[in-house]
């Protein structure tokens, strides 16, 4: 088995006031689309989702990690995405150049007013136990684990940094959409 664990945290200032930023990030179903390498597979309910982390590593190995999550809007301007219990897990599978398993995805966004802007403290974690692809079984386990750890940390940084950029870039379009709905 390959142990996949990665986490990252970032703090950034969003160019809008706190209630507006909280409403924007509270639309989690939309925001999930801004996560690089992660796609929305299914919305069970407006606050419950199945996600898929999918990458091709070392130019050959297709890695797929499914995670069932729910969102919670907490007191104090906090949004949490955390594991959804009770869903049937995806069956772990492996091939010569592929591995699929159920994993866990969590994130936390805390919002704080900074003048006319909002500071966002964002953290994310992904973890899973992947069956070792057949093409990697001849390599020593410690070597595979080190490679997996290095790749996972790189991918998690890409996800967090990409999410921040994509969400900030998408905000004006969301704002225009909200204003159009108000005019009707």
Predicted feature residues:
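Hydrophobic ligand-binding cavity/cleft-lining segments
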Residues: 1-59
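Short structured motifs
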Residues: 7-8, 36, 52, 92-94, ...
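Solvent-exposed residues in well-ordered beta-strands and their adjoining turns
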Residues: 13-17, 54-56, 70-74, 112-114, ...
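Short, surface-exposed charged micro-motifs
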Residues: 40, 68-70, 108-112
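Glycine-rich portal/gate segments that line the openings of hydrophobic small-molecule binding cavities
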Residues: 44-95, 162
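Beta-strand/loop substructures that line and gate deep hydrophobic ligand-binding cavities in soluble
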Residues: 94-150
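A conserved amphipathic terminal alpha-helix motif
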Residues: 137-184
């Amino acid at each position: 088995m390959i142990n996949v664990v990665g986490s990252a945290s970032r703090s950034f200032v969003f160019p809008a006031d706190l209630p507006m930023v909280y409403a924007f990030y509270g639309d989690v179903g939309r925001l999930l689309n801004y996560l690089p390498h992660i796609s929305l597979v299914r919305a069970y309910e407006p606050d419950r989702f199945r996600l898929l982390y999918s990458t091709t590593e070392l130019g050959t190995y297709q890695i797929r990690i499914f995670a069932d999550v729910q969102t919670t809007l907490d007191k104090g301007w906090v949004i949490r995405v955390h594991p959804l219990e009770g869903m049937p897990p995806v069956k772990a599978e492996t091939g010569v150049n592929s591995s699929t398993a159920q994993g866990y995805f969590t994130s936390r966004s805390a919002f704080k007013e900074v003048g006319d802007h909002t500071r966002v403290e964002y953290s994310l974690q992904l973890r899973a136990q992947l069956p070792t692809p057949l093409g990697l079984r001849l390599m020593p386990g410690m070597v595979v684990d080190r490679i997996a750890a290095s790749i996972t940390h790189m991918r998690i940084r890409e996800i967090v940094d990409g999410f921040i950029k994509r969400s900030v870039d998408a905000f004006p379009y969301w704002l225009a959409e909200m204003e159009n709905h108000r005019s009707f």
